[in-house]
Amino acid sequence: DENENLYGPNENKAKAKDLTAGASYLTKEAGCTKLQAGCTMYQAYN
């Protein structure tokens, strides 16, 4: 299917980005438990 060839790799890249973002989010969340205000500022700038 031509569409599968066009969109398949992009979907895989999107999934990889989602996983990376998810890991980053969890890392930020872990830091948030210690410094809530600092984390809020950190998230606002990143």
Curated annotation (Swiss-Prot):
Entry superkingdom: Eukaryota
* KW DNA repair (keyword) present: no
Keywords annotated in UniProt: Cytolysis, Hemolysis, Ion transport, Membrane, Nematocyst, Secreted, Target cell membrane, Target membrane, Toxin, Transmembrane, Transport
Q: Where are the transmembrane segments?
A: none
Any Gene Ontology CC annotation: other organism cell membrane
Q: A biological process (GO) annotation for this entry?
A: killing of cells of another organism
| Gene Ontology terms, MF aspect | toxin activity
What does the UniProt entry say about where the protein is found? Secreted; Nematocyst; Target cell membrane
Role this protein plays: This toxin is a potent hemolysin devoid of enzymatic activity. Its hemolytic activity is inhibited by sphingomyelin but not by cholesterol. In erythrocyte membranes, it causes numerous cell membrane ruptures. It also exerces cytotoxicity to different cell lines. It exerces a positive inotropic effect. Also causes hemorrhage and necrosis by dilation of the blood vessels in the skin, and vascular leakage of fluids and rupture of alveolar walls of the lungs. Is a potent ichtyotoxin. May act as a pore-forming toxin.
Record's protein name: Toxin Up-1
Q: What is the lineage of its organism?
A: Eukaryota, Metazoa, Cnidaria, Anthozoa, Hexacorallia
